[in-house]
Amino acid sequence: MKIRVALLQLNPRIGKINENISNVYKLLSSSTQQQPTPPPSQTTITTTTTNQQLNSKFDLIVLPELAITGYNFPNSTAIKPYLESIDKFGPSLNLGRELSIKYQFILVIGYPEFSHDDNKIYNSCAVFNRFGQLIYNYRKSFLYETDEVWGCNENPIKGFPSIELDFSPTSNKIREDINVNETSETTTQLIITNIGICMDLNPYKFEAPFNKFEFSMSSYSQRAKLLICPMAWLNPSSPSILDNEEFDKSDKLELAQELESELKENLDSAEASWSTINYWILRFFPYLSHKYSIMPKWFNNKTSTEANNDEKVTVLCCNRVGVEEDVVYAGSSCILQFNNHGKYNDATDLTNESVELIGNLDQINESILIKEIDL
């Protein structure tokens, strides 16, 4: 099955909701041509497409973690004006609903949630079907330190349960909405899907064993073929991760400005953060063909009696760009596919032949990546 996917790589500024929403619409309505280069103080909006114009029909669009609010809030008071809930939509959820209706696609958008059920704050992402209906709400399970600063809570539902998205032309629902008495002649095109937000890819609290691979192992055991990962992933050189004993806040702010300037000097020739993409690949180790990846592969390998020859596993990493105080984000949004061609080697990065980079964006520009992919 082929679907058209779009990843929006955004630079949401805290306190500028309307401007952030406007940038989303600009990206979606832009042509395939790169926009004129703005002044150095601004971020270029670029597009990367394949085989279709931007106004062509999408099947799925993904926006980053906390897509239009920004992420690095200093406390719970600061984020409070931006909180919304599934029973009281705010700007993020309204945008998701409006876009999914306008373009008639499945949409995933990250937003800060306040739950009226337990009066807690969550870092969440909502899934809308092509009719603007909220069909699934996922809450981040593994929290980064910034989440805790602004009062976020862990997902009370453990284990990264999967859902089934229906990509058939007339129905975009999760499995719970589907009649169990449907006949074999049904046109549903269900894809087992897992959603993980940024830190969910890492070991729990950075304390769990590195090779536990909680998110990817859970996805693998549920035979998920589509993994959707909205992110606010840091640049490996982000000053925010430097030792506080060696660098004070003013030092980090200065270093962040220097890094931002350095990146912007190469706007037109900007590349992805390849170390970031390679790390993401490593975090999906169970899907790699590697001599130490001992999980029996259930997809694609023609020599396997277990495998379905038509299956690949697709990972959508939708990250953000920009700078928030001393935090510099990595961008580099990408589409990865694991193919299990049966060629095993020691590589855990892009040089491993069992993983394909279908497309990627750079680490500085607000951009859109559009690809047609086989699921």
Please state what every model-predicted region is.
Residues 4, 124, 332-334, 367:
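Conserved beta-strand and immediately adjacent loop positions that scaffold enzyme active sites
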Residues 9-11, 64, 72, 139, ...:
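Residue-level recognition of beta-strand->loop/alpha-helix junctions
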Residues 11, 131, 339-341:
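Solvent-exposed strand-loop boundary residues in beta-sheet-rich modules
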Residues 88, 114-231, 235-244, 249-252, ...:
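Active-site catalytic loop in hydrolytic enzyme cores
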Residues 1-44, 49-60:
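N-terminal glycine-/serine-/threonine-rich phosphate-binding loop
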Residues 91-108, 202-361:
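CN hydrolase (nitrilase-like) catalytic-core segments centered on the catalytic cysteine
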Residues 31, 36, 40, 50-80, ...:
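Active-site beta-strand/loop signature of hydrolases that rely on acidic residues for catalysis
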Residues 4, 56-57, 104, 192, ...:
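Short loop/turn motifs at secondary-structure junctions
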